[in-house]
A protein has these predicted regions:
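Solvent-exposed N-terminal domain segments of exported/luminal and surface proteins
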Residues: 122-239
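A composition-driven signal for long, intrinsically disordered, charge-rich low-complexity tracts
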Residues: 10, 14, 54-60, 64-66, ...
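Sec/Tat signal peptide C-region and signal peptidase I cleavage site
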Residues: 30-35
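Generic structural signal for short, flexible, solvent-exposed coil/loop and linker residues
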Residues: 16, 38-40, 101-103, 336-337, ...
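Bacterial N-terminal signal peptides
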Residues: 14-29
Length: 438
């Protein structure tokens, strides 16, 4: 395993507390405590908390089987959903039978994952149960508001108390579908794009599929010596094979191996791996844009457009983004001409009677400094929304550039400012401090 694994985007772990010696069976339904030491103020709803296990110092054992995660709400200690995810020396997720069961030996670059919304109040050390032989407190902090929440990771060397019965998400590799209580996403077989998005009535949706498919257009132009090459690639040219899938209580992970079809006279070109992480109210796909020196020197033009094309039943839904704050309706043809398309923006929202979702597209800060923009794509017929990448010939340096695409199911019809909490997952990730308290 790699000692230099990446630190977490955000963090937190839970330990429980109870006064006196209490039998293990009590933990199945939660236990009443004395008053909490500090009340939770953290309000981040969508954020996963990903703790690099390298900071979990002083654990009595690195075997994951002996741990449970807890939080305190209204003076009651209860188990919350969590999982350990194993990563190898290269930082890749390990898809093994033991990892799937959440049982393996931790090293410095594995991850502990739970939801920020499940953190609770802080408890006094003396309230920790005698049935556990070790406890770690992780304080989760919003770097913007300084709001905090706490979670506690407890180790048991004897009989294990029950874990949380909650499972937030599941990915089915056979049907290529991810499902939570709030949304369902369908992936096209053998390709890396979506063909279905359903928002549950619990969040104002109808559970009807609003998405026809995602479409992609990549059209570079290269000039080398006396020749010019201008290939056109669409979403159909990028084939994938599911290389691994893991379902945990908190997140489901899908990894695919990608390849690019260069035409009938050429073999498919390997395109590396891509992950999608599914959480209870969101899913994200981090990616890497590779720009070798020779490609950069030969690049003369670059067109990129990626859109979600919606079904006709969604034509009454509305669109808005950071540079188009006014409501644009897909059914109004004039709105397509009125949309501002040439200014940079990092989010848009589509909403209506079928539910409301936000999509954010994050690019490297360097790109923005060089004048590369994420333009608006808004089309009334057929209804479609997405992004373009403008001024890509401004790329100045070769390298591998990190990007991220995230979908968030909003809890209500859009109100001004609702995007802030969703974007905070990527712009201002939660921070954590860890303390061994028993």
């Amino acid at each position: 395993m790699n000692k230099h694994g990446q630190l977490s985007l955000s963090a937190g772990v839970q330990a429980f507390g109870i006064c006196g010696c209490v039998c293990v069976a009590l933990f199945s339904g939660g236990v009443n405590l004395a008053s909490a030491q500090e009340a939770k103020t953290l309000t981040r709803f969508h954020d996963p908390v990903v703790v690099n296990t390298g900071i979990l110092m002083g654990l009595p054992t690195r075997n994951t089987a002996g741990y449970r995660l807890y939080s305190v709400h209204q003076d009651v200690l209860s188990p919350i959903p969590f999982q350990f995810d194993e990563r190898d020396d290269m930082g890749e997720i390990v898809f093994s039978e033991t990892a799937a069961k959440n049982e393996f030996r931790l090293d410095e670059n594995d991850e502990l994952v739970f939801m920020a919304k499940d953190t609770g109040d802080r408890i006094a050390t003396e309230l920790l149960p005698a049935t556990s032989d070790a406890a770690v407190e992780i304080e989760v902090t919003d770097p913007v508001t300084r709001a905090r929440g706490w979670a506690y990771l407890l180790h048991f060397s004897g009989s294990m108390p029950p874990s949380s019965p909650v499972t937030y998400v599941r990915f089915d590799a056979e049907t290529n579908q991810a499902r939570t209580s709030l949304y369902t996403v369908d992936n096209y077989p053998g390709r890396n794009f979506f063909t279905g998005l359903r928002i549950a009535p619990a969040l104002g949706g109808t559970d009807e599929n609003i998405l026809e498919r995602m479409k992609l257009r990549v059209h570079p132009t290269f000039s080398l010596f006396l020749s010019t090459w201008s290939p056109l690639f669409t979403e159909e040219d990028f084939s994938v094979r599911i290389d691994g899938a893991k379902n945990g209580p908190v997140r489901a992970i899908r990894r695919v191996r990608q390849s690019l079809n260069l035409g009938q006279y050429f073999p498919d070109m390997p395109g590396g791996t891509a992950y999608t992480y599914y959480y209870f109210s969101s899913f994200m796909t981090p990616s890497t844009f590779s720009a070798p020196w020779l490609v950069l020197k030969a690049l003369r033009d670059f067109e990129f457009v990626g859109v979600s094309e919606f079904r006709s039943s969604a034509s009454e839904m509305t669109y808005r983004d950071a540079v188009n704050p006014q409501e644009l309706t897909f059914s109004a043809q004039k709105n397509g001409a009125e949309a501002i398309t040439g200014k940079d923006h990092d989010w848009y929202v589509v909403g209506g009677k079928h539910g409301t979702h936000l999509q954010a597209f994050m690019i490297p800060e360097q790109w923005k400094e060089w004048g590369i923009l994420r333009g608006t794509v808004f089309r009334p017929e057929p209804p479609a929304a997405g992004y373009s990448l403008l001024n890509m010939t401004n790329l100045r340096e070769p390298g591998n550039y990190k990007m991220n695409m995230i979908f968030v199911i909003l809890t209500r019809p859009y109100h001004t400012g609702d995007e802030v909490q969703s974007l905070a997952m990527l712009k201002d990730p939660l921070r954590a401090t860890v303390d061994r308290i028993k």
